[in-house]
């Protein structure tokens, strides 16, 4: 099972990636983890990437694709892999296609933006313990305070509505076009292209997992 998981920030990709990887016995690969591992291992590509990053530059798509090819050739990818957050742009998808990286599925977890904003901007946390709440879905017993200590809850900067909206704007501009890219490729070249599947990411976690497994079985 070789697949790409697509979806906006806050769509629940991380949760579903864990379940999919457990079911199929495959590793979850993110470019950040992959870069860090290559740098730590001191591979030729890792050394090259470190030079770029140390100079404050962005690692090129060509280098990322070479790292991807190196990573998926490792033994833990024998049964497949799940790409999380990659490719992020059309040029990366094109480069992956040109490099002959074979994929079975592209699975999109689709959640309306207003639901994502509600999901993320409603989160509150207790800084000292890491306990998390949600003003609507999992509220504390007393609004704004931690159930255990009675200390005030905070809203992380990442969860503030304006931050969430900015991240969704970046996703719309850069990554959302991949949905059309892969769905159009699947229609044009069904034999060569990965199967494109979209599921709703709203509802309970178990419900969404069942949808994901059903989509990957067909």
From Swiss-Prot:
One of the protein's GO biological processes: AMP salvage
Major localization class: cytoplasm
Residue ranges of the region described as LID: 122-159
Keyword vocabulary terms for this entry: ATP-binding, Cytoplasm, Kinase, Nucleotide biosynthesis, Nucleotide-binding, Transferase
Binding site for AMP: 31, 36, 57-59, 85-88, 92, 156, 167
EC number: 2.7.4.3
Chain positions covered by the region annotation NMP: 30-59
Gene Ontology terms, MF aspect: adenylate kinase activity; ATP binding
Location(s), subcellular: Cytoplasm
Enzyme kind, highest EC tier: transferase
Job of this protein: Catalyzes the reversible transfer of the terminal phosphate group between ATP and AMP. Plays an important role in cellular energy homeostasis and in adenine nucleotide metabolism.
Database matches in PANTHER family: NUCLEOTIDE KINASE
Family to which this protein belongs: Belongs to the adenylate kinase family.
Subunit: Monomer.
Protein name listed in UniProt: Adenylate kinase
